Amino acid sequence: MENLESPNYEPALVYEWIIQLVSGTSREQALVELSRKREQYEDLALILWHSYGVMTALLQEIISVYPLLNPPTLTGPTSNRVCNALALLQCIASHPETRIHFLNAHITLFLYPFLNTLSKSKPFEYLRLTSLGVIGALVKNDSPEVINFLLSTEIIPLCLRIMENGSELSKTVAIFIVQKFLCDDVGLQYICQTYERFYAVASVLNNMVMQLVDSFAFRLLKHVIRCYLRLSDNPRAREALRHCLPEPLRDATFAQVLKDDHNTKKCLAQLLINLSDVAVVNQ
């Protein structure tokens, strides 16, 4: 492990925190320390995954809050604690040597109850956002294995609901995940395979566009346009979009907010060309 040679690396301390995490004596503090230091040690994921009892301890932390989800009684401190556990899972999901093991163990399924919550309180919002971060870490590297596995789960409907009802930050991570599915050929084919799947995605994107008319959330708009552009690569979806693409993307509604983003303007122009809206592009 190359980081053992780093002058800032404290292997004895890291292993002591792991012992505390597994033994349960000072688990909460161990979660805080490990999650705080996780970006300093690029091999921490390997230590976490291969250390006896660590994954069991992290899953215990996650499962322990299930009874607090419905009715929604999750408190801030409890949310912070489980989010520290989720941050360590994200560390494991991000590492190239542990990602596939993480996936094969179906750890992501333990996070879906968190994504399925509806409460808009800060503890729940933080829980959803951190859970999305774990999924985002998995899809970030465009791995076909990750896409294929997640397509067999309910992650897309969960992300769509968050895209419609979540905070701006949660919406941004959720649409990033959906965009990753769309950018994969298998993912695009899956979403466009039935009208119901396409309509579920398109209707949420349409609703987001109408919300963006008022909020002008730039990061979200970039993702929305890229999702539409990728959908237009599918012949059936392209034909449907000719009839249902929201008007604010056809006219100059977002011209001001996009004026300095040449890449996103090019994406929007290409989308309109794909849908044969040449007249609008040339205005």
UniProtKB/Swiss-Prot annotation:
<comment type="function">
    <text>A differentiation-controlling factor that is essential for the onset of sexual development. Induces ste11 when sexual development is invoked through nitrogen starvation.</text>
</comment>
<dbReference type="GO" id="GO:0005737">
    <property type="term" value="C:cytoplasm"/>
</dbReference>
<dbReference type="GO" id="GO:0030154">
    <property type="term" value="P:cell differentiation"/>
</dbReference>
<dbReference type="GO" id="GO:0005634">
    <property type="term" value="C:nucleus"/>
</dbReference>
<dbReference type="GO" id="GO:0017148">
    <property type="term" value="P:negative regulation of translation"/>
</dbReference>
<dbReference type="GO" id="GO:0000289">
    <property type="term" value="P:nuclear-transcribed mRNA poly(A) tail shortening"/>
</dbReference>
<dbReference type="GO" id="GO:0030014">
    <property type="term" value="C:CCR4-NOT complex"/>
</dbReference>
<dbReference type="InterPro" id="IPR007216">
    <property type="entry name" value="CNOT9"/>
</dbReference>
<dbReference type="Pfam" id="PF04078">
    <property type="entry name" value="Rcd1"/>
</dbReference>
<comment type="similarity">
    <text>Belongs to the CNOT9 family.</text>
</comment>
<protein>
    <recommendedName>
        <fullName>Cell differentiation protein rcd1</fullName>
    </recommendedName>
</protein>
<keyword id="KW-0221">Differentiation</keyword>
<dbReference type="GO" id="GO:0033620">
    <property type="term" value="C:Mei2 nuclear dot complex"/>
</dbReference>
<dbReference type="GO" id="GO:0000932">
    <property type="term" value="C:P-body"/>
</dbReference>
<dbReference type="GO" id="GO:0030015">
    <property type="term" value="C:CCR4-NOT core complex"/>
</dbReference>
<dbReference type="InterPro" id="IPR016024">
    <property type="entry name" value="ARM-type_fold"/>
</dbReference>
<dbReference type="InterPro" id="IPR011989">
    <property type="entry name" value="ARM-like"/>
</dbReference>
<dbReference type="GO" id="GO:0003723">
    <property type="term" value="F:RNA binding"/>
</dbReference>
